[in-house]
């Protein structure tokens, strides 16, 4: 079994969520009572990963601080006998989990962001989890499905894995996947035959499958990333490097189990907030009544 490190690229500017993200990192926008990035880290830890690398930017100090120990806050909560809150704060970075930071000096794309993590990862396989996409942990057990299943399959086959989902409609802003066999049920795996970042003419592709922002990558991706030239939007794209790797060896796409929300965009963020708000143990029932009242007006 391979001990994998996870990379979370958090250096993006969050332009789809402006003006909220002008001074606040999009990864720190709350979904009820936890910032978006916390859901991502919880998913990674549930999949069995103990070392996490945040690729950050000078404007993202709040993300780094979130995972640092706040001795003053913990002391205050202890003095005031706020044991539940203290436990929640201390669980932000669970025992045995290490969260490190590296900087991406220039916004040159997701592929470049991953390359910034190479000195900390070495010539080893690794995991990439995009912080925009939150997978609903109530719709799929993170101990068994999606990222956990991808890691298990990678350990079994040695092949790189890409999580995918069906997305009927306009795919021009997504990474579109074509597979050898149809992905017609949750958890099904098929070899990737084409992988295109933000296609100019998505209607010409016989596919409604997009990448979900979860990757388990073999060490063979490093040379491909080094050779990748700027692509869509003038950025070095991880998708382009994976597409080149798929020409040389099998790369699998796995159809996601459960539901996900693109929280890097307003609609996905609002949907996630409502979904998590409705099942919040403390306030969910009141929240539901409030929404029902608003809808009835």
UniProtKB/Swiss-Prot annotation:
GO biological process, one term: UDP-alpha-D-glucose metabolic process
Keyword list, A-Z: Lipopolysaccharide biosynthesis, Nucleotidyltransferase, Transferase
Pfam families, per the entry: NTP_transferase
InterPro entries, alphabetized: GalF, GalU_uridylyltTrfase_bac/arc, NTP_transferase_dom, Nucleotide-diphossugar_trans
SUPFAM superfamilies noted in UniProt: Nucleotide-diphospho-sugar transferases
Coiled-coil zones: none
One Gene Ontology term of the molecular function aspect: UTP:glucose-1-phosphate uridylyltransferase activity
Protein's pathway: Carbohydrate metabolism; nucleotide-sugar metabolism; Bacterial outer membrane biogenesis; lipopolysaccharide biosynthesis
EC number: 2.7.7.9
GO CC, alphabetical: cytosol
Catalytic reactions on record: alpha-D-glucose 1-phosphate + UTP + H(+) = UDP-alpha-D-glucose + diphosphate
NCBIfam families (alphabetical): galF (TIGR01105), PRK10122.1 (NF007516)
Record-stated family: Belongs to the UDPGP type 2 family.
Protein name: UTP--glucose-1-phosphate uridylyltransferase
Gene coding for it: galF
